């Protein structure tokens, strides 16, 4: 039934229309496009991310500060879905967590403004797992409450994208809001992959599988320069290891280094999380070759197809890839939302469901969020 709905969407001009915010290079959009949707308007502040989006997703992106854009501007079309990964650095668990008090923490309010103005049937917001604990859990409570007050039934869930076919352990929170009057009983999808391939699931896609057979003429596949010292360090780190595997008595060992630097891939496992920020030690490293991943390898680990060409310098492209939502990771989520656009579903009273939900202590509501693999 669902595959028929997707086919019907793809064969018509009535594809669900996406309004995309904090779009980056377009990873989240691409995943929804692969499920049968299309983006009609998008926004991002980064020039080069906009150029990559324009080249691969479509010439519908507006470059500029979202806080200066009025969602009621007549040039912004109506939509069925609003997507966005509002900036996550202030919620990240890798760095300090200022949360809503950080410089970028309140940008979710721009997302909220668009949802309140456009009233799409559904919205999807992506963020780091640290959002769930930021400001002593007050941040996620405030965010969910604000969207509920706009007339949405909101459900958050932690996704480990390796469990959805991405060759990378990457945990992110996906917040889905369904407009109350739709009566659509949305459920977050169940994983499609696991470590063993048992219980009817597929085995994880491994890093070795993902980065094999890259054509020599593939775009964004330039080797990154590393120092001789870094190369010597990498030769001391085993497959799947990191800086802490360097012998403590070795001259290249530095006391106090943290384990997420100089991480080398394990060919038979998904890669560790691909990130955007940080120095060379956080780039992610090949095995058996003692070198950093190329940007095309990073893109494959983020599940981007080879014909997705990133625009900008090597450093800029690395940032775009690390900031992106892996497209494959949200395809099942997009598919689970599609029935809302067919009206071919059994409706529930979301107003009543929301009243019942609000009677539960927020701490208990949070405890229902499924956690991913550490």
Swiss-Prot record:
Pfam families xrefs: DNA_methylase (PF00145)
Positions annotated as active site in the UniProt record: 88
Domain SAM-dependent MTase C5-type intervals: 16-344
EC number: 2.1.1.37
Keyword S-adenosyl-L-methionine: yes
Catalyzed reactions: a 2'-deoxycytidine in DNA + S-adenosyl-L-methionine = a 5-methyl-2'-deoxycytidine in DNA + S-adenosyl-L-homocysteine + H(+)
Biological processes, Gene Ontology terms: DNA restriction-modification system; methylation; negative regulation of gene expression via chromosomal CpG island methylation
UniProt GO molecular function: DNA (cytosine-5-)-methyltransferase activity; DNA binding
The entry's keywords: DNA-binding, Methyltransferase, Restriction system, S-adenosyl-L-methionine, Transferase
CDD domains for this protein: Cyt_C5_DNA_methylase
PANTHER family listed in its UniProt record: CYTOSINE-SPECIFIC METHYLTRANSFERASE, DNA (CYTOSINE-5)-METHYLTRANSFERASE 1
Record-stated family: Belongs to the class I-like SAM-binding methyltransferase superfamily. C5-methyltransferase family.
Record-given protein name: Type II methyltransferase M.NgoFVII
Species this chain originates from: Neisseria gonorrhoeae
Upper taxonomic lineage: Bacteria, Pseudomonadati, Pseudomonadota, Betaproteobacteria, Neisseriales
Gene name of the encoded protein: ngoFVIIM
